[in-house]
Amino acid sequence: MTKNDFTIPAILMISLLTLAPLANAGCCSEGTWDPSGFLNSDAGTGMPSQPIQSAQAEGSQESAAVSSSSPQNPPDRLASYPNGIIMKPMKSVSSSDVIIDASNGDGYAASHIKNAIHIPSKDLLDGNGNIKGDVELSRLLGEAGLSREDSVVVYGSAESSGEAQLAFLVLRHLGQEDVMLLDGSLDDWKAAGLPVEAQETIIPAAEYIPTARPGVIAEYDYVKSGQARIVDVRPFVDFGKGRIPASTALDPANVIKGDKIKNGGDLGTVFSRLDKDMPIVVYSDDYSQSALVAYSLQLMGYEAAVYSWGDWQAHEGKGDDTDSKYVKLGKT
């Protein structure tokens, strides 16, 4: 065998060894073509490429994280509440929901969420500012087209107004299982590019059959019994003149930041001195204010009901002016 006889096979062998990695890169173990295998190989070496985390890539990820939590893309604040299921994100509202605009005044006629019906929160109260009876409330809701089986979303002129919270609590009291407060106002809805209209929405009347739920609207005997922690949300000057014995004062402004209910972390500070193992009754001479605080307590997992200062006066007179304590519950 000549020298050239050895040279040619050697050259062929070297060529095959060089091409083998590229062949394997495009094949799976059974010998069929695998595009991902080829794409994941390094064309220069035939070795699988390794992901390299560059400083620039890390910076891009950090920028994305900052962007996602920016004011334009706020994180889901509902997760900050232990009982956030009673608040509904705007983007989760669907055509199957009955939307109630509980705002007072003439704002509804100017603009409202598309297909929202108008039930002003003041219509839930009688001439003395007390919550109407169950029969009258059921008639009002039925005439508006609502049934107890509906999925309901309520909003008001602003979260700070207490309008939607009062409607929410009245519906819960009547046994409405699926009712939530909208996480945002009409202005927030518009800013999100969601549909609005000025035309009044009218839906066919329905039969509203209530099933009264205890523990939402408190009664005198329960408040008198001492089974609940009593929170007074009237102006402090009124608290000083007379109050329910052993009550604690709380300014409703402490649960609001801007025109929204504070997030769970801040509310936790506000309510830090309240025991979750004890029911709470929130009272005022303005149900929108007591409802605002009671709803905020419910968001944080407390069992909270509303009560009327007027009802207490009807039974007890002006109330005690000594056996009470003023506590500023966590201004944040």
Feature annotation, model-predicted:
Residues T2-A10:
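Bacterial N-terminal signal peptides that target proteins for export
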Residues P9-P21:
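Bacterial N-terminal signal peptides
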Residues M1-T2, L22:
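Generic N-terminal leader/processing signal
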